[in-house]
Swiss-Prot record:
Alphabetized UniProt keyword annotations: FAD, Flavoprotein, Oxidoreductase
Biological source species: Rhizobium rhizogenes (strain K84 / ATCC BAA-868) (Agrobacterium radiobacter)
GO biological process assignments: D-alanine catabolic process
Name of the protein in question: D-amino acid dehydrogenase
InterPro entries in the cross-refs: DadA, FAD-dep_OxRdtase, FAD/NAD-bd_sf
Job of this protein: Oxidative deamination of D-amino acids.
Lineage: superkingdom: Bacteria
Residues noted as binding FAD in the record, renumbered to the chain: 3-17
SUPFAM superfamilies in UniProt: FAD-linked reductases, C-terminal domain (SSF54373), FAD/NAD(P)-binding domain (SSF51905)
Amino acid sequence: MKVTILGAGVIGVTTAYQLAKAGHDVTVVDRQAGPALETSFANAGEVSFGYCSPWAAPGIPQKALKWLFMKHAPLILRPKVDTAMLSWLVKMLSNCTSERYAVNKSRMLRLADYSRIALAEVRAGTGIAYDQRMQGTLQLFRTEQQLDASAKDVKALAADGIPYEVLDRDGCIRVEPALSHARDKIVGGLLTPKDETGDCFKFTNALAAKAVELGVQFLYGRTIKDLQVEGGQIRGVVTDQGAIASDAVVVALGSYSPLLLKQVGISLPVYPVKGYSLTIPIVDPARSPESTVMDETYKIAITRLGDRIRVGGMAEISGYTNDLGLARRNTLEHSVMDLFPGGDVSKAAFWSGLRPMTPDGTPVIGATKIRGLFLNTGHGTLGWTMSCGSARVISDLVSGHKAEIDTADLSVARYG
């Protein structure tokens, strides 16, 4: 079968690799000059199978109001006349209940755990290296209130059989020795030891090279204009350099997916939520993290990537903008220097990317009302984490097979 994948980020490339392994004739189309040059370029670097939660959670509306007035706020909202933004916000607020949180977190953990297995198989089968470490994620709490609030996450982890460990201050320092200088600033943490870290850009490029060896064709520098549909069946893709005939098409365009799908009558509640990162060269390993630490106060991930520290986080709801705000950089610097001052921030690279967020936190994976048109998008902050499992699911569905995990609640049909 001739399959065209739209998007060469980590989702598109892992999907291409799995479909090629399944024997399909695969073409990947992207407007950039190479793979992983947009949202997958400099993300936080965490592969967090256990630290995997929807942003829509009980208490978030109240916290959001407080965050809007914080100097180092994890949330930035820039309201505008945008019906897509308003609709998305309303849908997200409707998911901020205990009942919806439990449902959404459970299915996210299901997909994330499947991705853990799939990533291990890809790594074993290809031998690719990407500054990976397998030392877990430490969710770090600065207040007793944060520690107490983690009970709902502990309950979900236990229910899904995900290993975890609740730590006191000394336990956190045992896991991350560099925190010893900041012991008075922390009260405890939640460790998910099966989590990993790695450079998503390096991984995606290395896997793209393996996909080429399997016969995948990458068409870079092409802007996708439209989808060709006849009689309810996908027929191809229209680009600025001509049409590409296809038996099946997988849309993996991240935040830009709904803009394309709207043209063929599919409503997809995915909206861009901008995140920022700093990549800092390490000058003092003793004051640098061993793995990933989530600073719960600022919602910032601090990750060790070889001889670099990647600091990523925040949520800016401002539409399709990639501008770099100095205040956001200051927040990232404040968090990392407060906990892990082992890098030279004067030489840091500052970046922003648009995360494709759904209102319930779960990605949209599966078939659509148009035969042969599939979606693999909306992974939010967890695209790197969920990529390999999502790719396996799509490969099975495109091939006409039953997926190895339950996918009934992952498709766009859940939104009505």
